[in-house]
Regions:
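Interface-prone segments of viral and bacterial extracellular assemblies
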Residues: 1-150
Length: 150
């Protein structure tokens, strides 16, 4: 383990304890139209807000990529239609009607863990560890910390 502000657990693993099979964190959809080699519009995801599946995964259930998993780089919603951008283009081309299961993603920050998953008790990071700005601060005569003995 490393001491870092972000969580080092994988979303849904034994340390994280989020159930990714819960319908709140999982959606089923189909490709409507391919916008680029790794970006497509999808049906079936109307109940999820933009960003819900960012950093999540897509498991292909039909088409040439059936049985493969791909990571989601971004999830947008435009005029009620979901747009998914994958981290990498799948091995085989995506075509309209390819079906998939998509699972929520996590930003690895304590705020996401609390608001999106209500799972702060299982957060595996150190959110209060000082950042680089604490190392770069120095005492000044006019500031609250002038360098005198406390």
């Amino acid at each position: 383990r490393t001491f870092q502000a972000t969580c080092d657990a994988a979303l849904g693993d034994a340390r994280c304890r989020v159930d990714l099979e819960d319908p709140a964190y999982k959606g089923t959809g189909a490709v409507i139209d391919l916008l680029r080699d790794r970006t497509f519009t999808a049906s079936g995801l109307g109940g999820f807000e933009a960003g819900w599946f960012t950093f999540g995964t897509v498991d292909w259930t039909s088409g040439a990529n059936a049985g493969r998993r791909t990571e989601v780089l971004g999830h947008d919603v435009t005029d009620g239609v979901a747009i998914l951008t994958l981290l990498e283009a799948p091995v085989r081309p995506i075509i309209a009607t390819d079906a998939f299961v998509v699972r929520a993603g996590c930003h690895k920050r304590i705020a996401t863990c609390g608001t999106k998953f209500a799972n702060v008790a299982s957060f595996r990071g150190f959110p209060h560890i000082p950042g680089q700005d604490a190392v770069l601060r120095y005492a000044t005569k006019d500031g609250g910390h002038e360098g005198a003995v406390l």
